[in-house]
Amino acid sequence: MVNNRNEIEVRKLEHIFLCSYCNVEYEKTTLLEDIELIHKGTCGINFNDIETEIELFGKKLSAPIIVSGMTGGHSKAKEINKNIAKAVEELGLGMGVGSQRAAIVNDELIDTYSIVRDYTNNLVIGNLGAVNFIVDDWDEEIIDKAIEMIDADAIAIHFNPLQEIIQPEGDLNFKNLYKLKEIISNYKKSYKNIPFIAKQVGEGFSKEDALILKDIGFDAIDVQGSGGTSWAKVEIYRVKEEEIKRLAEKFANWGIPTAASIFEVKSVYDGIVIGSGGIRGGLDIAKCIAIGCDCCSVALPILKASLKGWEEVVKVLESYIKELKIAMFLVGAENIEELKKTSYIVKGTLKEWISQRLK
């Protein structure tokens, strides 16, 4: 367990640098390429009438897009969160912040997260680690501190066993996660009835996971499947110990691909599902919505854009929205509810996955 506050801050900066400038993406794909939306040549709608708006966690979004929680806890992270907040305010989208543990243990870092509320009144999602409720004995007061820090509309609890076991300073005790059931229930009764999101960090959730998360009481699941950023790959660049590098290389492609994770979760869970992990454009978003997601979250492309300024973040997100609307036009969907009902086929590896796991 990390006890040194500065060590957490340094790790935050290392993660920003490595994700921005090194090849940290999976070699395998999200399997979204195995989904084909059925083209409607007689689409029968006016492109200019297409509406992408949704309501999520009590907030209206102009499109089903959230910038995933990525960072905080360092002065550079403060600038990134500022740029993202300005961009989502401009476009009417939502955002999350990175793990707030750094500010939980060091109040001096709170402003690297709270700055988002200086620039956006839109949906903001907090972020805490599931493992810390076990190893650090966190309780409802920690959740309330994280929520108050950024006036959060929802709170994500991230599950990252692979990242923890590869990190030299990782926490390895994920036993007794059902402790979260009592904590979430107590928080909603004693503090605020706020939505709780179970969030992966790149390895996806299985149907078995989804059943556990449902029983614990999570209102939403952010699948964050494999095919995007590999945190094992990040550690290959970060750590100096050769044995840890070797292990990170072995598990660099571990995880459930995003599309497969969505099907897994949707097979047993009827709450809100967020598609994420390697989302690289509006067509990916359209596919996720078509197979059952309520919205999508995007991370790495936005992190890279944010280093160039908030205007660059706007450009990337605008391109995603434009691509989403084109996909909707081509399947004849005037709004997101109609997109959820659009026809598609599943082929290749994803079809095989579904036949073995879900039939």
Swiss-Prot record:
One of its GO terms (molecular function) is FMN binding. FMN binds at residues 68-71, 99, 127, 199, 229, 278-280, 299-300. Optimum temperature is between 85 and 95 degrees Celsius. CDD domains: IDI-2_FMN (cd02811). Transmembrane segments: none annotated. Inhibited by 3,4-epoxy-3-methylbutyl diphosphate (EIPP). It catalyses: isopentenyl diphosphate = dimethylallyl diphosphate. It is found in: Cytoplasm. Its cofactor is FMN; NADPH; Mg(2+). Mg(2+) binds at residue 164. Pfam families: FMN_dh. Optimum pH is between 7 and 7.2. Its EC number is 5.3.3.2. One of its GO terms (cellular component) is cytoplasm. The keyword Cytoplasm applies. It comes from the Archaea. One of its GO terms (biological process) is isoprenoid biosynthetic process. Substrate binds at residues 11-12, 99-101, 163. HAMAP family: Idi_2 (MF_00354). Homooctamer. Dimer of tetramers. Involved in the biosynthesis of isoprenoids. Catalyzes the 1,3-allylic rearrangement of the homoallylic substrate isopentenyl (IPP) to its allylic isomer, dimethylallyl diphosphate (DMAPP). PANTHER family: ISOPENTENYL-DIPHOSPHATE DELTA-ISOMERASE. This is Isopentenyl-diphosphate delta-isomerase. The lineage of its organism: Archaea, Methanobacteriati, Methanobacteriota, Methanomada group, Methanococci. The gene is fni.
